[in-house]
Amino acid sequence: MRKIFVLTILLSLIVTSCQNDKTYKNKLQVHYEHLDPQEIIIKDYAKALFSLDTANFADEIRKIQNEFPVFLEGDLNDIGAVNYLKGFATDTFCIRINNMVEKKFSNNNKLAKDIKSVYQIFNYYYPNITLPDVTYLYVSGIDPNIPSVMIMPNGILISADKYLENENSIYDYIGMPRYLSQRCRPSYITRDLAKAIYSTYIDNKQYQKDVLTDMINAGKELYFIEALNPSLPDSIIMGYSSKQMTWAEEYEGDVWAAIVGNNMLYAKNAEIFRSLFGDAPFTQAFSNDSPARLGEYIGLQIIRSYMTNNDVSLQEMLNNNDIHQIFQTSQYKPRKS
């Protein structure tokens, strides 16, 4: 009889644990399909630019100015500006990249569908904010200083050449580290779109206050990205390889124990910030198999735990600036491996 009682208690604990583990996921499954879909228009500026007759470039570029004002709002009577554009459109490396872009993005129906889904979910949460209805594909020359997705007042800009999956080893050719080029895939576009939406419309936080604050602020952003992309795997949300994701999940408790045990939770040291939040191939303090930005990963787990254990909405969580209240009520207690 005692064995049956103990077994019943154990099963109850397991079921309860599983239910709690899924609660935040349940909150992310919102019913947005009934909302009127915002029309998604995709315009290919790259194709238009690189298709121009370069023998008569000045006249040709003016013909597409009205269709692509976000790129061509300057004075096209300025010979210097025209020559700059012509130089870009005739650059052999840029032409090579554009040829890859045309092949990779020959059909944008799926992209439009994916963007529409992100828009609908965002409008479910924020019905009073209207996102731009035009998305532009363009070639940046794989400029590392330009965000892959940007939101402008009159359009969303997607640097299509940053989503080529290292085709023909193009990212290796320019010396891009593999930990960065692994994120240069079309499956990252809606993740980067959600990130751009967050930074444009939602985020008002100050970072590098202390480690815990940065963890939770990073966790808020990642949870928002997940909310707008509930089907994306954690590896894409975090920007990790599958191997790195496995390591993070397996050693989460050990990482947390090291942070707490070494009194880093409220640290303000720049070196500690770099170790926990800096982008790199791995986190040197742990293992060559570990991913970087483990502070962000822990932050996401804290927010997930907070959403699981508290009856709050996405907006309420994002608007809550009481870092310590979030941490205390999250009941975050990972187990060591």
Identify the role of each PLM range:
Residues 50, 69, 73, 123-127, ...:
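Sec-exported extracytoplasmic/periplasmic mature domains
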Residues 218-282:
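Acidic/His/Gly-enriched intrinsically disordered linker/tail segments
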